[in-house]
């Protein structure tokens, strides 16, 4: 049998009158005897303080304060302590023989409130030889000791091996240890439990029937049915949570679209503005850089323009200075050209008239001769024509009768004969007998030459004849011409002078003929001289442009160098053009590629976002479309496996739920019908009787009763035999056992207990062997243990089922997401990153732009060098051909020499011009001067002979020509032979006729032509004479005008003058053109400089403004980025696909979202205000604040009982997965959690029956208690009538009130309260809520009325009240009640504490002198029977015979107060025995 724990001693350290006193406590009764003020109450106060160290409860009052409403301010504790550290310690030993010292350290706190500081502690493992006073005191000398502080006590105990010291910060922990170690009977979990315990101790201490206990006796005696209540609370909490969750799901379902809409629109609103600002910031940075580049370029351009302006202004000044002289020279050259042209025109007229006169003179002379010859020829022709006419007429008459025609042979014969005759005539005339037709052509050339020679000789003689004929008239004319040229001379000298003049005229004419070559030579030399001067000017200008003086010898080498430079630069320029074209082509290709990639980038980004979401959801990285499709197949397989596993877990969970429901039946009945049968038979279920069996005993009893563990125990089997007839609504096997349910035991069977098994001898010939079940369910503890394990398993299964359901739905949604991804993005998701390619291409584009700029600069420099080189080469090309001119130093001398020669030639030309006509007239008639008249006859003969020779030669040539012409006729010999005989006469006639007709025709024609010619010649002669006279007059006028002009007019003068004028005009035009160009260039340069200056000012202003804007925007942007990163929304706002939209598109997107958001947040004042503030375009961070506010608002709206995330976007995604599953699961859970009203009534009724039985058992222990006239004490328990009606309605008439219990708007407690109000409308419920009333109705203790009754004298049983009993009777009755309460607490706490511990039982009784000896003996007997310790305080006249008695005497010695204590053992029946150590007086010493 388990020994009960005992209090061994009480130790007081530094209390008022007790410095270090240990009271050994008796196992039964310890009596404190002493007079008033001896310290009895102080000792008990120290015990109570160590037992309940709660200053809110402790209140030590004396009997004079019993009716007072308030006691002393220190609650009676402050005044009982001495200054310094005080201790109160209880030394106990529990059922396990463990020594435990518990206590408190007390210390007065200075102040008018007289507070006390309490620190509880516990010491375990202390050896039995160590006394408590040795722990907390330190001996200084024989008469002095010091109290240790709590820290010093801890250090001291730490040095002791095996000793554990615990200090507690809460009273709950302190009492929890005392309960676990068996020091107190009840676990004091709360302040309410401590208050009950203190009220019990207080009632025990001061004695009597405590109204605080009797009024709430149900709370003390009836244990709280925590299991049932907890089950109801859990059920209602679960139902409430279930309904709240379902409501939350419904709210969430309604909010889901709002969430989506709000998040979507807020994201579009803020992200569009965020990305627009990001784009604008990038654009502004690019613009600022572009402004800066353009600013530097413009500054360079302005500097170049300024240098260019200075050069052009200097050059313009030079050209302005040269223009005046050029204009004067040009005007002089123009005037000279006009004079030369006028002179030339006059000279041309003169020459033309002179030529015309000469021609007219010749024509006139020739015409005179022609007219004379024509007249003679006319006479001859007339005579010849008449003779020919006569001959033709005669021949025609002879041939009138002859045949008129011949055939072809005759014609050929004629032609042959003519050819033969012509050949013969040629031989005869030419004296060539060997002449043949073949050699006729050669001879023809010879005779034609002879004819020509004879003709020339004839003409010469003819001329001489003519001269001779006119010699007389011409001699005088020739003489006059010689005299006009030479002056007067003798006639005999005329021939010699004429010849000399003709020779001199030839020389002069030769010199005159050299005028033009000399003039040309002079013009050429002058041109060369001008070219030399121009070359010198060009050389000077070239040296000036080159900035260096060059020698003539260096120009060729420089030309070659420049040519080579031009060639290289030309190649560079041409290659540069190709390179530039290639670069521009590549740039265009890059731009086109970038545009294509920018169009493709949003699609790719959307695909990547979808792919990243899939990767985040599945935790996999995909690198190809094949991996996606393979993972999709794996996903399908995983989904099938998860569905199978979920269904298996769901089946197991349902089985566990069914088993829990079966085990949760009241009374342990697995079948509801057993409860109805037990009520019908008036019995009790066996499992209900053994409901309190311990967990250790459950296997034994389960095996003992075997199948009959669900039997019904009835008082009498014979009374229910009739009820068994026709019984159908019952289990297949119904066990009935006869016995008293109030005193039933297991003696009905003969049992042999084996190892983990029993053998039950049911009858002599029937045994049953039953092993202990591994999982017993017999008894409430076993069922609760099994239910607890099943609940744990169910929680695991539920969690696993929820996880699997979540995984299944997640997998299904993931499968849908994969399907959408494959359908929409698979084709582009695994292509190369277009943004990386865009960055690479942009880098390449920047390189190309930089290369193009560098190339353009280099090309510009090369072009400039090329132009300079070309200009130099052009100048050298003009100079090089003139190098010899530049080197010719004698050119000017040669010009002077030629000028002198030209002057001589011009003098000769003037002579020829003056006497040329006379010389020309003299020359043909000069021979007249040498001829004399006597030579005329000889000339005549020579002329005749020459004429005959010429005629013969002409005939010979004619005959040979006829032979040559008739060479083809010599082949017609055959035709001649045929016609030779008969056609001779005819041929002759014809020949003569033909000759005559020909002659006649010639004569006529000649006559006509000569007649016409004669008339024409006469007319021409008249017109020539008239023209000659007119032009002679005009010639004289023109010569006078030419002399008036005074300009030498030669053939090259006009050309030289024009060339000079044109050169000067070209120079002037070039100068003016260059000046105009320079003026225009200067104007353009000044305008360009002004434009550049304005542009520079504008660029500087724009650059500074843009830079300030960039800097300002950077600060704002940094604040925005900091806010974005601090709130973790960058991933939501930085949507890269929006970077490819324009600012207008983003602004439109933001405005549309803003309009939608205004409607969405119209009902939310906070979001509406934040949205209104965010509309400020100058404060972009406010949009971020709005976005964060939206997220915070949505986080607050997220139901954390459904969605375990702070991210609203993830919450929406999880909602989609969770809502349908939770709705289905919670609906089924609500159906399972709901409990029927009948079950509630049965549970409450069974609990009431069980507690009534327990109270009856407790009453058995009170039957022998008697005090004075009180013979017995009992507890009376009854069910309240209103509550009994409620139970009946719940059991039998619940169908009438299903409107309450089936309502989803009411919890079960509220429905129960509504039913109670419906059944008892007369009861006023006050301000309590239905939930509170319902919870009270679920507590079975509220159904019971409990009161204490005493059997007193002749009054019989009456209610125990202090007014009806004497003081002693009331003290005894109250003490009896307290003992029963303690025993009830122990029974209640037995299941919570280890079974090997029986707690300590101790009560107090102050002022025990009011009890008589018989009553005190009754208390002693009660303590002995209940193994209870009792501490009583009594005056000195109390001397109990049993237990231990301490005599306390308070003494004062030298202003020092102390209590003298003497302890005595009980003296009956033994002699009194003095306890060791009790004779020594306590001598307090000063604390050192």
UniProtKB/Swiss-Prot annotation:
InterPro entries: MukB (IPR012090), MukB/SMC (IPR050308), MukB_hinge (IPR032520), MukB_hinge_sf (IPR042501), MukB_N_dom (IPR007406), P-loop_NTPase (IPR027417). One of its GO terms (molecular function) is ATP binding. Its main location: cytoplasm. GO terms for cellular component: cytoplasm; nucleoid. Residues 1049-1074 are annotated as: Disordered. ATP binds at residues 34-41. It holds the Pfam family MukB. Residues 1051-1065 have a biased composition (Basic and acidic residues). The keyword Cell cycle applies. It is found in: Cytoplasm, Nucleoid. Residues 666-783 are annotated as: Flexible hinge. Residues 326-418, 444-472, 509-602, 835-923, 977-1116, 1209-1265 form a coiled coil. Keywords: ATP-binding, Cell cycle, Cell division, Chromosome partition, Coiled coil, Cytoplasm, DNA condensation, DNA-binding, Nucleotide-binding. One of its GO terms (biological process) is DNA replication. SUPFAM superfamilies: P-loop containing nucleoside triphosphate hydrolases. NCBIfam families: PRK04863.1. The hinge domain, which separates the large intramolecular coiled coil regions, allows the homodimerization, forming a V-shaped homodimer. Belongs to the SMC family. MukB subfamily. Homodimerization via its hinge domain. Binds to DNA via its C-terminal region. Interacts, and probably forms a ternary complex, with MukE and MukF via its C-terminal region. The complex formation is stimulated by calcium or magnesium. Interacts with tubulin-related protein FtsZ. This is Chromosome partition protein MukB. The lineage of its organism: Bacteria, Pseudomonadati, Pseudomonadota, Gammaproteobacteria, Enterobacterales.
């Amino acid at each position: 049998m388990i020994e009960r724990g005992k209090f061994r001693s009480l130790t007081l350290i530094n209390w008022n009158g007790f410095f270090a006193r240990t009271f050994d406590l008796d196992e039964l009764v310890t009596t404190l005897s002493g007079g008033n003020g001896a310290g009895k109450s102080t000792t008990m106060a120290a015990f109570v303080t160590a037992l309940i160290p709660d200053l809110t409860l402790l209140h030590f009052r004396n009997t004079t304060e019993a009716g007072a409403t308030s006691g002393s301010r220190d609650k009676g504790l402050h005044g009982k302590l001495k200054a310094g550290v005080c201790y109160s310690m209880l030394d106990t030993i529990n059922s396990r023989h463990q020594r435990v010292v518990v206590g408190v350290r007390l210390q007065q706190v200075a102040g008018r409130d007289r507070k006390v500081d309490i620190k509880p502690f516990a010491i375990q493992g202390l050896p039995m030889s160590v006394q408590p006073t040795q722990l907390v005191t330190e001996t200084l000398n024989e008469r002095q000791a010091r109290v240790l502080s709590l820290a010093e006590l801890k250090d001291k105990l730490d040095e002791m091996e095996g000793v554990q010291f615990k200090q507690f910060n809460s009273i709950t922990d302190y009492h929890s240890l005392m309960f676990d170690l068996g020091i107190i009977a009840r676990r004091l979990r709360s302040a309410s439990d401590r208050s009950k315990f203190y009220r019990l101790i207080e009632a025990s201490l001061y004695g009597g029937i405590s109204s605080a206990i009797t009024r709430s006796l149900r709370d003390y005696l009836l244990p709280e049915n925590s299991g049932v209540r907890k089950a109801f609370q859990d059920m209602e909490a679960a139902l409430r949570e279930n309904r709240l969750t379902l409501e939350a799901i419904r709210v969430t379902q309604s909010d889901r679209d709002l969430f989506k809409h709000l998040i979507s629109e807020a994201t579009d609103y803020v992200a569009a503005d965020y990305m627009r600002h990001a784009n604008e910031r990038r654009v502004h940075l690019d613009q600022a850089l572009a402004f800066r580049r353009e600013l530097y370029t413009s500054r360079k351009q302005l500097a170049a323009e300024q240098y260019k302006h200075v050069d052009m202004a200097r050059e313009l000044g030079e050209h302005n200075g040269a223009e005046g002289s050029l204009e004067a020279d040009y005007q002089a050259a123009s005037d000279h050209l006009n004079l030369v042209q006028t002179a030339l025109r006059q000279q041309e007229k003169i020459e033309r008239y002179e030529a015309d006169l000469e021609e007219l003179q010749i024509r006139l002379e020739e015409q005179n001769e022609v007219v004379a010859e024509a007249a003679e020829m006319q006479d001859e022709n007339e005579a010849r024509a008449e003779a020919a006419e006569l001959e033709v007429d005669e021949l025609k008459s002879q041939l009138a009768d002859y045949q008129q025609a011949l055939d072809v042979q005759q014609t050929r014969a004629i032609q042959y004969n003519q050819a033969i005759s012509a050949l013969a005539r040629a031989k005869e005339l030419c004296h060539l007998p060997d002449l043949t037709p073949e050699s006729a052509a050669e001879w023809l050339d010879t005779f034609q030459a002879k004819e020509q020679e004879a003709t020339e000789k004839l003409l010469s003689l003819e001329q001489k004849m003519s001269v001779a004929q006119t010699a007389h008239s011409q001699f005088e004319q020739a003489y006059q011409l010689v005299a006009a040229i030479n002056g007067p001379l003798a006639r005999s000298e005329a021939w010699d002078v004429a010849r000399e003049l003709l020779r001199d005229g030839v020389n002069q004419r030769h010199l005159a003929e050299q005028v033009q070559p000399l003039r040309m030579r002079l013009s050429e030399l002058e041109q060369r001289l001008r070219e030399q001067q121009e070359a010198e000017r060009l050389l000077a200008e070239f040296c000036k442009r080159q900035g260096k003086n060059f020698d003539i010898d260096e120009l060729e080498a420089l030309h070659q160098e420049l040519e080579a430079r031009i060639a290289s630069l030309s190649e560079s320029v041409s290659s540069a053009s190709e390179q530039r074209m290639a670069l521009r082509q590549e740039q265009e290709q890059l731009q086109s590629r970038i545009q294509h990639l920018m169009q493709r980038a949003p699609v790719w980004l959307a695909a990547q976002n979808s792919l990243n979401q899939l990767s985040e959801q599945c935790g996999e990285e995909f690198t190809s479309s094949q991996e996606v499709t393979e993972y999709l197949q794996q996903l399908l397989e995983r989904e099938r496996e998860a569905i199978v596993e979920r269904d298996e877990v769901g089946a197991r969970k349902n089985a566990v739920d069914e088993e829990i429901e079966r085990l949760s039946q009241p009374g342990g009945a697995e079948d509801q019908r057993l409860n109805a049968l037990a009520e019908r038979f008036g019995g009790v279920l066996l499992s209900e009787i053994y409901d309190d069996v311990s967990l250790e005993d459950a296997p034994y009893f389960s095996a003992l009763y075997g199948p009959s563990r669900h039997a019904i125990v009835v008082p009498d089997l014979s009374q229910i035999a009739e009820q068994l007839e026709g019984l159908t609504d019952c289990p297949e096997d119904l066990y009935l056992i006869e016995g008293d349910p109030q005193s039933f035991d297991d003696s009905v069977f003969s049992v042999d207990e084996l190892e983990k098994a029993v053998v039950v001898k049911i009858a002599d010939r029937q045994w049953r062997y039953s092993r202990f079940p591994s999982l017993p369910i017999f008894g409430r503890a076993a069922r609760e243990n099994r239910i607890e394990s099943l609940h744990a398993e169910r929680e695991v299964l539920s969690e696993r089922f929820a996880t699997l359901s979540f995984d299944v739905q997640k997998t299904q949604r993931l499968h849908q997401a994969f399907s959408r991804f494959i359908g929409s993005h698979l084709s582009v998701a695994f292509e190369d990153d277009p943004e990386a390619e865009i960055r690479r291409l942009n880098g390449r584009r920047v390189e190309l732009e930089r290369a193009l700029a560098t190339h353009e600069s280099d090309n510009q420099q090369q072009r400039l060098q090329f132009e300079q080189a070309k200009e130099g080469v052009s100048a050298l090309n003009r100079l090089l051909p003139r190098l010899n001119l530049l080197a010719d130093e004698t050119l000017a001398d040669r010009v002077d020499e030629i000028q002198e020669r030209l002057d001589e030639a011009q003098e000769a030309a003037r002579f020829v011009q003056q006497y040329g006509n006379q010389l020309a007239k003299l020359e043909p008639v000069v021979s007249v001067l040498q001829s004399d008249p006597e030579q005329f006859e000889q000339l005549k003969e020579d002329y005749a002979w020459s004429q005959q020779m010429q005629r013969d030669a002409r005939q010979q040539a004619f005959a040979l020509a006829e032979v040559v012409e008739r060479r083809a006729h010599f082949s017609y010999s055959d035709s001649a032979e045929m016609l030779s005989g008969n056609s001779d006469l005819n041929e002759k006639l014809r020949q003569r006729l033909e000759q005559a007709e020909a002659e006649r025709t010639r004569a006529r024609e000649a006559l006509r032509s000569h007649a016409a010619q004669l008339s024409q010649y006469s007319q021409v002669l008249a017109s020539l004479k008239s023209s000659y006279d007119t032009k002679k007059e005009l010639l004289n006028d023109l010569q006078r005008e030419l002399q008036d002009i005074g300009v030498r007019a030669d053939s090259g003068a006009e050309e030289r003058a024009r060339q000079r004028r044109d050169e000067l005009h070209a120079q002037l035009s070039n100068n003016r053109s260059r000046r105009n160009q320079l003026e225009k260039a200067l104007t353009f340069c000044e305008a360009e400089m002004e434009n550049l200056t304005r542009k520079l000012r504008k660029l500087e202003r724009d650059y500074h403004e843009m830079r300030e804007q960039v800097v300002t925007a950077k600060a704002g942007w940094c604040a925005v980025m900091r806010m974005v990163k601090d709130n973790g929304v960058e991933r939501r706002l930085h949507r890269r696909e929006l970077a490819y939209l324009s600012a207008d598109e983003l602004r439109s997107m933001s405005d549309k979202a803003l309009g939608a958001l205004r409607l969405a947040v119209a009902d939310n004042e906070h979001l509406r205000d934040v949205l209104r503030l965010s509309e400020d375009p100058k404060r972009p961070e406010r949009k971020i604040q709005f976005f964060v506010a939206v997220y915070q608002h949505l986080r607050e709206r997220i139901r954390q009982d459904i969605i375990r995330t702070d991210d609203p976007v993830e919450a929406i995604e999880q909602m989609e997965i969770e809502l349908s599953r939770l709705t289905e699961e919670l609906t089924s859970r609500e159906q399972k959690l709901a409990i029927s009203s009948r079950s509630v009534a049965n549970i409450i009724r069974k609990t009431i029956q069980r507690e009534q039985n327990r109270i009856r058992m407790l009453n058995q222990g009170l039957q022998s208690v008697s005090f004075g006239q009180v013979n017995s004490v009992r507890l009376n328990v009854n069910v309240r009538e209103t509550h009994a009606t409620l139970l009946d309605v719940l059991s039998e008439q619940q169908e009438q009130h299903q409107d309450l219990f089936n309502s989803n708007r009411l919890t079960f407690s509220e429905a129960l309260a509504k039913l109670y109000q419906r059944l008892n409308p007369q009861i006023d419920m006050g301000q309590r809520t239905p939930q509170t009333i319902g919870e009270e109705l679920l507590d079975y203790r509220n159904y019971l009325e409990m009161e204490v009754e005493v059997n007193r004298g002749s009054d019989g049983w009456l209610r125990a009240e202090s007014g009806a009993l004497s003081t002693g009777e009331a003290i005894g009755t109250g003490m009896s009640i307290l003992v029963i309460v303690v025993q009830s607490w122990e029974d209640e706490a037995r299941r919570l504490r280890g079974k090997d511990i029986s707690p300590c039982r101790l009560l107090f009784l102050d002022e025990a002198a009011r009890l008589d000896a018989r009553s005190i003996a009754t208390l002693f007997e009660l303590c002995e029977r209940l193994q209870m310790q009792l501490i009583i305080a009594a005056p000195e006249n109390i001397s109990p015979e049993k237990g231990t008695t301490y005599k306390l005497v308070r003494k004062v010695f030298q202003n020092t107060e102390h209590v003298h204590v003497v302890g005595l053992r009980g003296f009956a029946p033994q002699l009194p025995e003095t306890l060791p150590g009790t004779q020594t007086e306590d001598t307090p010493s000063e604390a050192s």
